[in-house]
Design a protein with these regions (language model features):
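Domain-scale detector for complete catalytic domains at protein termini or as standalone homologs
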Residues: 1-87, 94-255
């Protein structure tokens, strides 16, 4: 399905497609594995943004619009005849949400469910008033990355590894900073799909409740033990996949 999408377990006859959007600086491999965790009724498609993995020679995206445009151009034919859902963690929560909004506004299409993780709603007040992480100097930026967690020590302690790791991360953080500061809460919810927020209990506080203002559909919050990258813990990852699977089973019975 194009260089944008990594699908380890292609299932053309699946009833539902789960599209997973990467965290800042992330690639597609973590989510592509999920295809092996779901049954034959679900096809997992992991988004691969420019500047990483097989797209490492391509320039990074410069704006949220650029990401949305590419995702929709590639995915639109796959979205028009089959149920689909979105999942996004951290930066991926914003890219998946923004893509869902554009799909509904321009094409009348909407995911059956939006799963967002590890992120405040884009109109959360403190996001608009906090210091832009993309404007931190290299030392401060690395200190912030370390505080968030999730980055292996062998990368943080290796200068050459950091030279490969930090550029895509910083590029995504620039997109994030510009997106949240230009986002104004709409007068009415832009989405009508169900929305679930996942979060780690030890992560920094997120304004999860504000996500409810962005959809007229069902809304719930589900927390798991751990910090910002709680989903990298095998037990949490299993719980996350189980939660999504149960929702998809219910959706498929109603198709």
């Amino acid at each position: 399905m194009d260089k944008l999408v990594n699908c380890f377990y292609g299932r053309p006859d699946a009833l539902t497609r789960l599209f997973c959007f990467p965290w800042a600086g992330g690639g597609s491999l973590f989510y592509a594995r999920w295809g092996g965790f779901f049954d034959e009724s679900v096809e997992v498609c992991s988004i691969r943004l420019p500047g990483r993995e097989s797209r490492s020679s391509e320039p990074f995206t410069q704006s949220m619009d650029q990401i949305i445009d590419e995702v929709i151009t590639v995915l639109l034919p796959q979205l028009q005849g089959k149920s689909f859902v979105f999942f996004g963690h951290s930066f991926g929560a914003f890219t998946s949400f923004a893509t869902a909004v554009r799909l509904k506004e321009k094409y009348g299409l909407e995911p059956a469910h939006l799963f967002v993780s590890g992120a405040s709603a884009p109109h959360a007040k403190f996001l608009h008033s906090s210091i832009k992480k993309s404007e931190l100097n290299d030392g401060e930026f690395l200190k912030w990355v370390t505080s968030v967690g999730g980055t292996p020590a062998e990368i943080l302690g290796n200068k050459e590894a950091l030279q490969l790791f930090l550029p895509p991360l910083k590029a995504d953080v620039i997109v994030f900073d510009n997106f949240v500061r230009s986002f104004d809460k709409p007068a009415s919810p832009p989405l009508s799909c169900s929305l679930t927020c996942f979060d780690g209990t030890e992560d920094i506080p997120h304004d999860l409740a504000a996500w409810q203002e962005l959809t007229s559909g069902d809304f719930n919050i589900h927390k798991m033990p751990g910090g910002h990258f709680y989903l990298k813990d095998p037990k949490n990852e299993k719980s996350l996949v189980t939660y999504i699977s149960k929702y998809l089973e219910t959706t498929e019975r109603n198709l």
